[in-house]
Amino acid sequence: MEENIFIEEQMNLSFNIMNDLRKRKELCDVVLCVGDLEIYAHKVVIASFSPYFYAMFTNDVVESRQNSITLKSMDSKSVELLIEFAYTARIRITEENVQYLLPVSCILQISPVKKACCDFLQSQLDPS
């Protein structure tokens, strides 16, 4: 007899621990430099949520061997929110950040956030 089980709490616990490690800058293997901001992360985590980072880290490009990656022409606060999303699956979309968050989520190919931004903008439309 065999049984496959899924314990969601374990997955949540694991990501909470990884996020805590990230916040303490422990066991991180990449630093994303966006403007004046340095965002510490784990390549495996950000590659798992972004096809952009997946391609960057799994192909034979210069960035795949670097520990520091400069992201140009991206809003630093949006990148920070998206990295937080990679670890928590939560993101706060506001009238103030949606105009910056949407283009960065498109560049990084983060479809759930892109859709959430579009839904947010659509909900803000006034038919009059």
Predicted regions, residues:
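Cytosolic, low-complexity regulatory segments enriched in Ser/Pro/Gly with interspersed Lys/Arg
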Residues: M1-F6
